[in-house]
Protein backbone atom coordinates (compact mmCIF):
# COMPACT_ATOMS: atom_id res chain seq x y z
CA UNK A 1 0.00 0.00 0.00
CA UNK A 2 1.24 3.44 -0.96
CA UNK A 3 0.37 6.35 1.30
CA UNK A 4 -0.01 9.73 -0.38
CA UNK A 5 0.79 12.78 1.70
CA UNK A 6 0.90 16.54 1.01
CA UNK A 7 3.48 18.99 2.13
CA UNK A 8 1.72 21.34 4.47
CA UNK A 9 4.37 23.98 4.07
CA UNK A 10 3.89 23.98 0.32
CA UNK A 11 0.12 24.40 0.73
CA UNK A 12 0.59 27.33 3.06
CA UNK A 13 3.02 28.92 0.60
CA UNK A 14 0.53 28.65 -2.26
CA UNK A 15 -2.19 30.14 -0.07
CA UNK A 16 0.08 33.05 0.71
CA UNK A 17 0.64 33.56 -3.02
CA UNK A 18 -3.13 33.86 -3.54
CA UNK A 19 -3.59 36.48 -0.84
CA UNK A 20 -2.16 39.45 -2.81
CA UNK A 21 -4.62 38.78 -5.59
CA UNK A 22 -7.57 39.07 -3.23
CA UNK A 23 -6.12 42.19 -1.65
CA UNK A 24 -5.62 43.76 -5.06
CA UNK A 25 -9.21 43.01 -5.98
CA UNK A 26 -10.41 44.67 -2.77
CA UNK A 27 -8.55 47.88 -3.66
CA UNK A 28 -10.38 48.37 -6.98
CA UNK A 29 -12.94 51.19 -6.46
CA UNK A 30 -15.29 52.50 -9.18
CA UNK A 31 -14.38 55.99 -10.43
CA UNK A 32 -17.87 57.35 -9.99
CA UNK A 33 -17.78 56.44 -6.31
CA UNK A 34 -14.71 58.62 -5.92
CA UNK A 35 -16.53 61.50 -7.70
CA UNK A 36 -19.45 61.27 -5.31
CA UNK A 37 -17.20 61.41 -2.32
CA UNK A 38 -15.54 64.55 -3.73
CA UNK A 39 -18.79 66.64 -3.93
CA UNK A 40 -19.11 69.69 -1.71
CA UNK A 41 -21.80 69.03 0.95
CA UNK A 42 -23.02 72.63 0.59
CA UNK A 43 -24.02 71.96 -3.04
CA UNK A 44 -26.48 69.24 -2.09
CA UNK A 45 -30.09 70.67 -1.76
CA UNK A 46 -32.16 68.97 0.92
CA UNK A 47 -35.24 67.13 -0.31
CA UNK A 48 -37.59 69.15 1.95
CA UNK A 49 -36.31 72.45 0.60
CA UNK A 50 -36.81 71.32 -3.00
CA UNK A 51 -40.40 70.33 -2.22
CA UNK A 52 -41.07 73.73 -0.65
CA UNK A 53 -39.77 75.52 -3.75
CA UNK A 54 -41.93 73.28 -5.93
CA UNK A 55 -45.08 74.12 -3.94
CA UNK A 56 -44.27 77.84 -4.05
CA UNK A 57 -43.88 77.69 -7.82
CA UNK A 58 -47.19 75.83 -8.20
CA UNK A 59 -49.10 78.31 -6.03
CA UNK A 60 -47.50 81.25 -7.81
CA UNK A 61 -48.47 79.92 -11.22
CA UNK A 62 -52.02 79.21 -10.00
CA UNK A 63 -52.43 82.78 -8.71
CA UNK A 64 -51.04 84.22 -11.94
CA UNK A 65 -53.42 82.09 -14.01
CA UNK A 66 -56.40 83.13 -11.88
CA UNK A 67 -55.41 86.79 -12.24
CA UNK A 68 -55.16 86.47 -16.01
CA UNK A 69 -58.58 84.79 -16.23
CA UNK A 70 -60.34 87.32 -13.98
CA UNK A 71 -58.62 90.26 -15.61
CA UNK A 72 -59.49 89.00 -19.07
CA UNK A 73 -63.14 88.51 -18.12
CA UNK A 74 -63.34 92.05 -16.70
CA UNK A 75 -61.67 93.60 -19.74
CA UNK A 76 -63.96 91.64 -22.05
CA UNK A 77 -67.03 92.87 -20.21
CA UNK A 78 -65.71 96.43 -20.04
CA UNK A 79 -64.55 96.81 -23.62
CA UNK A 80 -66.29 94.12 -25.66
CA UNK A 81 -69.75 94.03 -24.08
CA UNK A 82 -72.27 95.05 -26.70
CA UNK A 83 -75.94 95.82 -26.17
CA UNK A 84 -78.59 93.52 -27.53
CA UNK A 85 -80.16 96.37 -29.54
CA UNK A 86 -79.24 99.98 -30.29
CA UNK A 87 -81.78 102.54 -31.47
CA UNK A 88 -81.66 106.19 -32.38
CA UNK A 89 -85.16 107.53 -31.92
CA UNK A 90 -87.07 110.75 -31.57
CA UNK A 91 -90.22 111.57 -29.66
CA UNK A 92 -92.50 114.53 -30.31
CA UNK A 93 -94.21 116.04 -27.30
CA UNK A 94 -96.30 119.03 -26.37
CA UNK A 95 -94.30 121.19 -24.02
CA UNK A 96 -97.23 122.92 -22.34
CA UNK A 97 -99.04 119.56 -21.89
CA UNK A 98 -102.16 120.64 -23.76
CA UNK A 99 -103.85 117.50 -25.07
CA UNK A 100 -106.98 117.90 -27.15
CA UNK A 101 -109.04 114.76 -27.64
CA UNK A 102 -111.30 116.44 -30.18
CA UNK A 103 -109.62 119.64 -31.34
CA UNK A 104 -111.94 122.33 -32.67
CA UNK A 105 -111.38 124.27 -35.84
CA UNK A 106 -110.57 127.52 -34.03
CA UNK A 107 -108.20 125.89 -31.55
CA UNK A 108 -104.52 126.78 -31.97
CA UNK A 109 -102.34 124.12 -33.47
CA UNK A 110 -100.38 122.14 -30.94
CA UNK A 111 -96.70 123.06 -30.82
CA UNK A 112 -94.62 119.93 -30.71
CA UNK A 113 -91.02 119.71 -29.68
CA UNK A 114 -88.75 116.77 -30.32
CA UNK A 115 -86.38 114.76 -28.16
CA UNK A 116 -83.81 112.62 -29.92
CA UNK A 117 -81.69 110.10 -28.08
CA UNK A 118 -79.57 107.01 -28.54
CA UNK A 119 -80.98 104.01 -26.65
CA UNK A 120 -79.02 100.84 -25.94
CA UNK A 121 -80.81 97.91 -24.32
CA UNK A 122 -78.95 95.15 -22.47
CA UNK A 123 -81.93 92.84 -22.14
CA UNK A 124 -80.11 89.97 -20.42
CA UNK A 125 -78.68 92.35 -17.81
CA UNK A 126 -81.99 94.28 -17.45
CA UNK A 127 -80.23 97.57 -18.17
CA UNK A 128 -81.13 100.54 -20.37
CA UNK A 129 -78.50 103.04 -21.46
CA UNK A 130 -79.76 106.35 -22.84
CA UNK A 131 -77.57 108.99 -24.42
CA UNK A 132 -79.17 112.41 -24.84
CA UNK A 133 -77.15 114.57 -27.24
CA UNK A 134 -76.91 118.34 -27.16
CA UNK A 135 -80.57 119.33 -27.46
CA UNK A 136 -82.09 121.73 -29.94
CA UNK A 137 -83.13 124.02 -27.12
CA UNK A 138 -80.55 125.56 -24.79
CA UNK A 139 -82.57 125.03 -21.60
CA UNK A 140 -81.72 121.31 -21.37
CA UNK A 141 -78.40 119.56 -20.79
CA UNK A 142 -76.92 116.63 -22.70
CA UNK A 143 -76.64 113.56 -20.52
CA UNK A 144 -76.03 109.83 -20.28
CA UNK A 145 -78.56 107.84 -18.26
CA UNK A 146 -78.45 104.28 -16.91
CA UNK A 147 -81.55 102.45 -15.66
CA UNK A 148 -80.45 99.27 -13.86
CA UNK A 149 -83.46 97.08 -13.04
CA UNK A 150 -81.38 94.53 -11.14
CA UNK A 151 -79.92 97.16 -8.83
CA UNK A 152 -83.17 99.19 -8.97
CA UNK A 153 -81.17 102.36 -9.52
CA UNK A 154 -81.02 105.20 -12.04
CA UNK A 155 -77.89 107.24 -12.67
CA UNK A 156 -77.67 110.55 -14.56
CA UNK A 157 -74.37 111.86 -15.90
CA UNK A 158 -74.73 115.53 -16.79
CA UNK A 159 -72.22 116.06 -19.59
CA UNK A 160 -72.08 119.83 -19.07
CA UNK A 161 -71.23 119.52 -15.37
CA UNK A 162 -69.39 116.18 -15.65
CA UNK A 163 -71.12 114.97 -12.48
CA UNK A 164 -73.17 111.89 -11.66
CA UNK A 165 -76.46 111.69 -9.76
CA UNK A 166 -77.99 108.44 -8.47
CA UNK A 167 -81.56 107.80 -7.35
CA UNK A 168 -83.82 104.74 -6.86
CA UNK A 169 -85.40 103.57 -10.10
CA UNK A 170 -88.91 104.89 -10.74
CA UNK A 171 -90.67 102.02 -12.50
CA UNK A 172 -93.83 104.10 -12.98
CA UNK A 173 -91.92 106.24 -15.48
CA UNK A 174 -89.26 103.89 -16.86
CA UNK A 175 -90.41 100.96 -19.00
CA UNK A 176 -88.72 97.58 -18.42
CA UNK A 177 -86.17 96.72 -21.12
CA UNK A 178 -88.40 94.18 -22.85
CA UNK A 179 -91.36 96.58 -23.08
CA UNK A 180 -89.18 99.48 -24.16
CA UNK A 181 -87.65 97.31 -26.85
CA UNK A 182 -91.11 96.49 -28.22
CA UNK A 183 -91.99 100.19 -28.23
CA UNK A 184 -88.83 101.09 -30.12
CA UNK A 185 -89.46 98.35 -32.67
CA UNK A 186 -92.96 99.72 -33.26
CA UNK A 187 -91.60 103.25 -33.63
CA UNK A 188 -89.02 102.04 -36.13
CA UNK A 189 -91.65 100.11 -38.09
CA UNK A 190 -93.94 103.14 -38.17
CA UNK A 191 -96.83 101.40 -36.40
CA UNK A 192 -96.62 103.86 -33.52
CA UNK A 193 -96.37 107.60 -34.11
CA UNK A 194 -94.44 109.06 -31.18
CA UNK A 195 -96.51 112.17 -30.48
CA UNK A 196 -96.94 112.52 -26.78
CA UNK A 197 -96.86 114.80 -23.77
CA UNK A 198 -94.30 115.92 -21.22
CA UNK A 199 -94.26 115.20 -17.51
CA UNK A 200 -92.02 116.84 -14.93
CA UNK A 201 -90.09 115.38 -12.03
CA UNK A 202 -88.21 117.42 -9.46
CA UNK A 203 -85.15 116.09 -7.66
CA UNK A 204 -82.92 117.54 -4.97
CA UNK A 205 -79.22 116.81 -4.48
CA UNK A 206 -78.42 115.41 -1.03
CA UNK A 207 -75.27 113.51 0.02
CA UNK A 208 -72.13 112.78 -1.92
CA UNK A 209 -71.34 109.15 -2.76
CA UNK A 210 -67.67 108.46 -2.13
CA UNK A 211 -67.59 104.91 -3.50
CA UNK A 212 -69.55 103.77 -6.56
CA UNK A 213 -68.19 100.20 -6.58
CA UNK A 214 -71.36 98.77 -5.02
CA UNK A 215 -73.75 100.42 -7.50
CA UNK A 216 -73.37 97.76 -10.17
CA UNK A 217 -71.11 97.40 -13.18
CA UNK A 218 -73.02 99.73 -15.50
CA UNK A 219 -73.39 102.61 -13.05
CA UNK A 220 -69.78 102.16 -12.00
CA UNK A 221 -68.76 102.36 -15.64
CA UNK A 222 -70.78 105.56 -16.01
CA UNK A 223 -69.77 107.31 -12.78
CA UNK A 224 -66.27 106.19 -11.82
CA UNK A 225 -63.82 109.10 -11.52
CA UNK A 226 -66.81 111.49 -11.39
CA UNK A 227 -68.28 113.45 -8.53
CA UNK A 228 -71.35 111.41 -7.61
CA UNK A 229 -74.30 112.50 -5.48
CA UNK A 230 -77.55 111.04 -4.20
CA UNK A 231 -80.86 112.47 -5.33
CA UNK A 232 -84.13 112.70 -3.46
CA UNK A 233 -87.27 112.71 -5.55
CA UNK A 234 -90.04 115.19 -4.94
CA UNK A 235 -93.60 114.66 -6.09
CA UNK A 236 -93.85 113.96 -9.81
CA UNK A 237 -96.76 115.76 -11.39
CA UNK A 238 -98.12 116.05 -14.87
CA UNK A 239 -97.93 119.52 -16.26
CA UNK A 240 -95.70 122.48 -15.61
CA UNK A 241 -94.12 122.64 -12.20
CA UNK A 242 -92.90 125.93 -10.79
CA UNK A 243 -89.19 126.02 -10.23
CA UNK A 244 -88.55 126.85 -6.62
CA UNK A 245 -84.77 127.05 -6.84
CA UNK A 246 -82.58 128.97 -9.22
CA UNK A 247 -79.55 126.64 -9.02
CA UNK A 248 -81.05 123.90 -11.17
CA UNK A 249 -80.45 122.15 -14.44
CA UNK A 250 -82.76 120.14 -16.68
CA UNK A 251 -82.43 116.89 -18.58
CA UNK A 252 -85.16 115.94 -21.07
CA UNK A 253 -85.39 112.31 -22.06
CA UNK A 254 -87.83 109.47 -22.69
CA UNK A 255 -87.96 105.79 -21.81
CA UNK A 256 -91.72 105.41 -22.18
CA UNK A 257 -94.54 106.65 -24.39
CA UNK A 258 -94.15 110.12 -22.93
CA UNK A 259 -91.27 112.55 -22.46
CA UNK A 260 -89.81 113.37 -19.06
CA UNK A 261 -88.23 116.61 -17.91
CA UNK A 262 -85.97 115.90 -14.95
CA UNK A 263 -85.21 119.01 -12.91
CA UNK A 264 -82.24 118.59 -10.56
CA UNK A 265 -81.61 121.28 -7.96
CA UNK A 266 -79.02 121.73 -5.24
UniProtKB/Swiss-Prot annotation:
Complex formation: Homodimer; disulfide-linked. Interacts with SPPL2A and SPPL2B. Interacts with APP. Mature BRI2 (mBRI2) interacts with the APP amyloid-beta A4 protein; the interaction occurs at the cell surface and in the endocytic compartments and enable alpha- and beta-secretase-induced APP cleavage inhibition. Mature BRI2 (mBRI2) interacts with the APP C99; the interaction occurs in the endocytic compartments and enable gamma-secretase-induced C99 cleavage inhibition. May form heterodimers with Bri23 peptide and APP amyloid-beta protein 40.
Tissues showing expression: Expressed in the brain, testis, testicular sperm, epididymis and mature epididymal sperm (at protein level).
GO BP, one annotated term: negative regulation of amyloid precursor protein biosynthetic process
Residues bearing carbohydrate: 170
Cytoplasmic face of the membrane: 1-54
Region Necessary for interaction with APP and inhibitor effects on APP processing, annotated ranges: 102-134
Family named by the database record: Belongs to the ITM2 family.
Chain's role: Plays a regulatory role in the processing of the amyloid-beta A4 precursor protein (APP) and acts as an inhibitor of the amyloid-beta peptide aggregation and fibrils deposition. Plays a role in the induction of neurite outgrowth. Functions as a protease inhibitor by blocking access of secretases to APP cleavage sites.
Entry PTM: The ectodomain C-terminal part of the imBRI2 is processed by furin producing a secreted Bri23 peptide and a mature BRI2, membrane form (mBRI2). The remaining part of the ectodomain of mBRI2 containing the BRICHOS domain is cleaved by ADAM10 and is secreted (BRI2C, soluble form). The membrane-bound N-terminal fragment (BRI2C, membrane form) is further proteolytically processed by SPPL2A and SPPL2B through regulated intramembrane proteolysis producing a secreted C-peptide and a BRI2 intracellular domain (BRI2 ICD) released in the cytosol.
Molecular function in Gene Ontology: amyloid-beta binding; ATP binding
Keywords: Cell membrane, Disulfide bond, Endosome, Glycoprotein, Golgi apparatus, Membrane, Secreted, Signal-anchor, Transmembrane, Transmembrane helix
Protein name: Integral membrane protein 2B
Disulfide pattern: 164-223, 248-265
Pfam families, A to Z: BRICHOS
GO cellular component, one term: endosome membrane
PROSITE patterns for the chain: BRICHOS (PS50869)
All ranges on the Lumenal side of the membrane: 76-266
UniProt domain BRICHOS: residue ranges: 137-231
Coiled coil spans: none
Amino acid sequence: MVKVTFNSALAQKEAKKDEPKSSEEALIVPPDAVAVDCKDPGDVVPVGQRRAWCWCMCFGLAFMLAGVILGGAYLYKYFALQPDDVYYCGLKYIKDDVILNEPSADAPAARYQTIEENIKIFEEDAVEFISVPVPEFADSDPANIVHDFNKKLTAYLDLNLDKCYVIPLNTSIVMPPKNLLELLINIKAGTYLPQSYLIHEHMVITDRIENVDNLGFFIYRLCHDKETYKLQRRETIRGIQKREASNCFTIRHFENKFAVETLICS
